[in-house]
């Protein structure tokens, strides 16, 4: 097994230095951290992801690098959300939001992204109202600072739609879902995000209309999602496997058992290969 630096080097000591001397901030190597993170994610090595992020967060804290801490808390809240660890996700979300204010970054796109991430954490753990509060802040930020074709805008619209659905605001949710699909259609490999959104729309239609009344609409949305997931040009990497695993149970819920099995087979094949 290859040892990484974080496996054997202790974080810098925050108390080291001359008495009474305040150490200057020392930035952590963000590019290298993210490159290694994506490598672990592509291999679906989630234990390595956690170890890697926690190591570098300790480094950023020891080195008084608050911008580095912001980036790492953003990554950690997303990691713990995917691992369904509520307390840890909330802890890092709250810290990231706090750092935005401390750094005076409220008017930056980074702030918008942090609010999206924090809202997604709250929506994921059953607080759609709290999620929407962050999403509205992010929407004002993004629509001011980003072109509407930016993938981050599409991701925000999708997350807002999920929270609106959970709040029973179905018409607003459908409008947001369709905005998300339009944006993602302009992205390279955007088929995966579009597929997820069509499946989210199927769930929203069932919630709004009831299973029987929504049947035809749900079938249309599932067929569109399946076609997108079958796009041959999509890279068969760790993220593709993650999306397959995320989407498969939705197809199973609606009786598309062959599609469910095929998606799980693809995910397993990728994991075994990597």
Locate predicted features.
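Short coil/turn linkers that connect adjacent helices within long alpha-helical scaffolds
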Residues: 23-24, 62-65, 102-106, 144-148, ...
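Alpha-helical segment of the N-proximal tetratricopeptide repeat
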Residues: 26-63, 78-82
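Residues that mark the junctions of alpha-helical repeat units in TPR/alpha-solenoid scaffolds
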Residues: 29, 49, 62, 69, ...
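Conserved alpha-helical positions within TPR/SEL1-like repeat arrays
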Residues: 31-42, 70-82, 109-124, 151-166, ...
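Amphipathic alpha-helical segments of tetratricopeptide repeats
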Residues: 54-59, 95-102, 139-144, 178-186, ...
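Short coil/turn linking the two alpha-helices of tandem helical-hairpin repeats
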Residues: 104, 119, 146, 188, ...
